[in-house]
Amino acid sequence: MVKLWRRYKPFINAGIQELITYRVNFILYRIGDVMGAFVAFYLWKAVFDSSQESLIQGFSMADITLYIIMSFVTNLLTRSDSSFMIGEEVKDGSIIMRLLRPVHFAASYLFTELGSKWLIFISVGLPFLSVIVLIKILSGQGILEVLGLTVLYLFSLTLAYLINFFFNICFGFSAFVFKNLWGSNLLKTSIVAFMSGSLIPLAFFPKIVSEILSFLPFSSLIYTPVMIIVGKYDASQILKALLLQFFWLIVMVGLSQLIWKRVQSFITIQGG
């Protein structure tokens, strides 16, 4: 364990330093995310104001507001830029430096991201989550229930990030074949945002569509952890959702290993 820590600590430090160095860029992107959350809030407010019902698909306006907030936080903590990093490093040729290091290829990206994720969690995720927990307790929910859901949310959040990371690693490996992933990365991000429930809760889709999307790995990224913290899942649904997350994590890890063995023969160094 000590040897592993010493080997990957520089990557963790690099992730932290990168976030600190480009903090203005990070803040500007987050402002854009917050503006998007406000747009979503007012769209849903208009929907509820025009509806005769106080509940739509089991959601009240308060539930939707909490969903929007936690979707923003969860997206921030589970997103992975590994496919973008691989694509850029393949394009400019710097991928050779990573390949020459005596470390696991995917793990080097993982620990770099973990460095930045830890900083984001402390500075953004924890304050938001603390406020949500406090509001839930003050609204009359039992302390043990709220704390239990929070722990389950954090566990689900961890699984969600790992699924997303290895999915992006798999996608990023295609850069060794196609050489440029800029356009396809943007398309991938948009599709995943839609299918993960980040924009619209999957419960609002037609039943058959909702069931299909709920089984796919993308629902595990945003929808599952957010539904847990919002309190829309009972104990059996939480267990089922967590088992599905475990399943997709195993699939993504296995798939990443398989694809990596296949694409190594396509490695060519560009740039100079």
Regions found by a protein language model. Give the residues of each.
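Hydrophobic transmembrane alpha-helices and immediately adjacent juxtamembrane helices
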Residues: M1-G272
